[in-house]
Amino acid sequence: MSHSLRVVFAGTPDFAAASLLALLDSRHQVVAAYTQPDRPAGRGRKLTPSPVKALAQEHGLPVHQPTSLKDTDAQQTLAALEADVLVVVAYGLILPQAVLDIPRLGCLNVHASLLPRWRGAAPIQRAIEAGDTRSGVTIMQMDAGLDTGAMLLVRETPITATTTGGELHDRLAPLGGEAIVEALDALATDGLTATPQPSEGVTYAAKLSKAEAELDFTRPAHELAARVRAFNPWPVAWTRLAGEPLRLWLAEAEAEAERPGVAPGTLLQSAPDALRIACGHDGTQVVRITRAQLPGGKPLAVRDLLNARGERFPEGLRLGQEDRA
């Protein structure tokens, strides 16, 4: 029969909180939580605790918020907790080798991709953006590299032609929680084998930036649609409509048909429920935008947007231009 492990948890955002919640509901004993220092948030820029801190405090856990784990005092504080294992999920601090060596069973990481594909900061969004048809979570034994440790457990989930970054995040977060509990249960009975990551198929998921969210309509329709879905809910894909930002929340590639090319970014005759935009290097492909947001407005289904503000979207207008019409 498996026994309970002493766990220290390190994580920061909502994605990490899902794993902490699963651990709190498991047979294992979470003895402390590590998370990023409180950050200013909201319009008032009020110091706000991370989702992991809020959850830990609800359950009466001691919370540690060091700015670094590289100094010996911080490492001694961690060592004094006498953890069997440190579980790390989207923590945001680099763990030096001295920290990785502290727990008896080392440090386990919940990573939101099928490693070795999409090591790095934004695996959920990059998988959708690249047109991947599957994603998942990998439980990894951490080493000093960037998401390079041996794999202990992998759980998959499909990516469909309509999956957004937010939807995949919300599916993977609880899946990560289930997987880390399963991994700890197995570790407690010596029933888990570490598999080195293959050297083939390594890709890196660069951190998202607002700068890359502006669409380039010379790109193919399937690529634009994937980018729109990947960047929902952040940083949100956008273009310029008569010089003003038009945010694009949902999109799909239109089935290719023989049609004359026009300048990429040109608004074509609208469908009742979609903005049809010419794209591709020769303007012969079409990307359909089905949910969008005008400045000062809220995201709307394009059907509702056209009913309310159809005059803003005349056929022939070219999107992505700096100048106002």
UniProtKB/Swiss-Prot annotation:
Task: Select a single GO molecular function from the record's annotations and give it.
Answer: methionyl-tRNA formyltransferase activity
Query: What domain of life does the native source organism fall in?
Result: Bacteria
Binding-site list for (6S)-5,6,7,8-tetrahydrofolate: 113-116
Q: What class of enzyme is it?
A: transferase
Q: Which reaction does it catalyse?
A: L-methionyl-tRNA(fMet) + (6R)-10-formyltetrahydrofolate = N-formyl-L-methionyl-tRNA(fMet) + (6S)-5,6,7,8-tetrahydrofolate + H(+)
Q: What is its EC number?
A: 2.1.2.9
Concerning PROSITE patterns, the annotation shows: GART
Cellular component terms per the entry's GO annotation: cytosol
* Entries under Pfam families matching the protein: Formyl_trans_C, Formyl_trans_N
Q: Any keyword tRNA processing?
A: no
Q: Which SUPFAM superfamilies match?
A: FMT C-terminal domain-like, Formyltransferase
| Family of the protein in this entry | Belongs to the Fmt family.
**What is this protein identified as?**
Methionyl-tRNA formyltransferase
From what organism does this protein derive? Chromohalobacter salexigens (strain ATCC BAA-138 / DSM 3043 / CIP 106854 / NCIMB 13768 / 1H11)
Q: What is the lineage of its organism?
A: Bacteria, Pseudomonadati, Pseudomonadota, Gammaproteobacteria, Oceanospirillales
- What gene name is listed for this protein? fmt
